[in-house]
Amino acid sequence: MTPTTETMVGIGGAAESTDMVLNIGPQHPSTHGVLRLRLVLDGERIQHAEPVIGYMHRGAEKLFEARDYRQIIMLANRHDWLSAFSNELGVVLAVERMLGMEVPERAVWTRTLLAELNRVLNHLMFLGSYPLELGGITPIFYAFTEREELQHVMEEISGGRMHYMFNRVGGLKEDLPAGWATRARACVAALRSRLDVYDDLVLGNEIFRGRTRGVGVLTPEAVHAYGVSGPIARGSGVDFDLRRDEPYLAYGELQDTLKVVTRQEGDCLARFECLLEQTHNALDLADACLDRLAELPPGPINQRLPKVLKAPEGHTYAWTENPLGINGYYLVSKGEKTPYRLKLRSASFNNIQALTELLPGTLVADMVAILGSLFFVVGDIDK
């Protein structure tokens, strides 16, 4: 019997190339917190993307149920640590609506002023960190210099650099310190004079434009499907801003100053341009609020409250145009001193869902550019 020769073909030579699963995170330089992305790759192309969230979940909504209406303000400003004042504001607006409470005019204008200054602080962080994620280290030094100056102004009035705890049900903790308005106006003017550096240093940089123009295009249909809001939605041509379309605080009287910035391209560059122009407009709104406060006569800054504050039985919904998008607060009360339920609708949670639409078909090298252009805070996603 003559021996036969057999030829074996290895599976690697006969089969088609298989997709590779790549985990980005949970700890990664391009995320503000701990976010994990599970990517399925075909070569250098992303075939499928799945954001894996929950690493910073602390059960904020459940904790609200064990705190009274004064204490929940302390919890509300922590999930998005870059928009602390705006988060406090949404909660107190919901409680005040439940109580049918009128807030003094001086408190309304001061809240509007501080909300816009907080918006500038938030945007400066991303205006500096986004170019850093694409390899440009210089802008973040400018951004943090401006933030430090503005943080001193916010710290002087509230005592806190990040978690202000300045809102109260019925108004604010206290009136503006003597001379604070003058210092705030000087800070706003200085910031405005130096914001042009981003036009020259960032938007004028051909490498930055090459990395962002036409990359990560989000369609208006996807914006509506995923509930995306804020500068990300407006960068895709969705012309909606609660401050104009459903005014709260003093925004109804600021319609001549308020400018809703939109772009039609829907790419990373459009989102960055919206953020930058929105920062300019927030400084204009802050100036308008300072002018109005200077005209107001001295008066109360808050309402007198009972020792034990109880909301009547019922439910209400309040929403605000936070720096990162729309935040909603659904409050259910059983007539007790603690909320029966307080549901948070955070902007970052909805915005990050769009990654499943944005990433497939793009290069791995563009992943960080797209991820950073969504301007999210992981604590705001996980709560």
UniProtKB/Swiss-Prot annotation:
Presence of the UniProt keyword Cell wall biogenesis/degradation in the record: no
Name the InterPro entries on file: NADH_Q_OxRdtase_suD, NADH_UbQ_OxRdtase_49kDa_CS, NDH1_su_D/H, NiFe-Hase_large
Annotated compartments? Cell membrane
Gene Ontology CC: plasma membrane
Q: Which Pfam families match?
A: Complex1_49kDa
Q: Which reaction does it catalyse?
A: a quinone + NADH + 5 H(+)(in) = a quinol + NAD(+) + 4 H(+)(out)
Q: Would you indicate the residue range of the signal peptide?
A: none
List the membrane topology term(s): Peripheral membrane protein
Q: Which UniProt keywords apply?
A: Cell membrane, Membrane, NAD, Quinone, Translocase, Transport
Source organism, top-level taxon: Bacteria
Top-level EC class, please? Answer: translocase
User: Any idea of its EC number?
Assistant: 7.1.1.-
Q: Which PROSITE patterns match?
A: COMPLEX1_49K (PS00535)
Query: What family does this belong to?
Result: Belongs to the complex I 49 kDa subunit family.
What subunit structure does UniProt give?
A: NDH-1 is composed of 14 different subunits. Subunits NuoB, C, D, E, F, and G constitute the peripheral sector of the complex.
Name it: NADH-quinone oxidoreductase subunit D 2
Which source organism does the UniProt entry give?
A: Streptomyces avermitilis (strain ATCC 31267 / DSM 46492 / JCM 5070 / NBRC 14893 / NCIMB 12804 / NRRL 8165 / MA-4680)
Give the taxonomic lineage as stored in the record. Answer: Bacteria, Bacillati, Actinomycetota, Actinomycetes, Kitasatosporales
